[in-house]
Amino acid sequence: MADPSFDIVSKVDEQEIDNAVNQTAKEIRTRFDFRDTGASATLSGESILLVANTDERVKAVLDVLQEKFVKRGISLKALSFDEPKPSGKEFRLSVTVQQGIADDKARAIAKKIRADGPKGVQAQIQGDQLRVTGKKRDDLQRVIQLLKAEDFEVPLQFVNYR
């Protein structure tokens, strides 16, 4: 019989992202404090574009977006954004949704498993995910608890537990 294993991934449901952006756009259209600010939120691929006529309004739109992400169960660790940039008469803020585990983060996770994990547990980097194998399921459970206690700045999900 094959050794027990599980995969560590960092994926965000695209439908939930779409729903959160649509809810944000709807709230922006109906809220009184966003009237006549030209505020909008649009999704295109892996990025979300937030637009408003002042720097503060763009940050307020970002707050609404983050609130909707939390309500839909999406980790804010999956979002990356910088400061709003002026563009003509409006300010734009691009928010990127990160999918998958970056190579440097994957190496840090594998190193943590080797250093602090139970003996006999191995982690292999497979593209944008990690496969963790071990002799006993109890060891794999300990690895999951170890990784949940750490902050790797990406949302981690544990799938394909066999």
Swiss-Prot record:
InterPro entries: DUF520, UPF0234-like_C, UPF0234_N, YajQ-like_sf. GO terms for molecular function: nucleotide binding. Keywords: Nucleotide-binding. It comes from the Bacteria. Signal peptide: none annotated. CDD domains: YajQ_like. Coiled coil: none annotated. Pfam families: DUF520. One of its GO terms (cellular component) is cytosol. Nucleotide-binding protein. Belongs to the YajQ family. This is Nucleotide-binding protein FRAAL1054. It comes from Frankia alni (strain DSM 45986 / CECT 9034 / ACN14a).
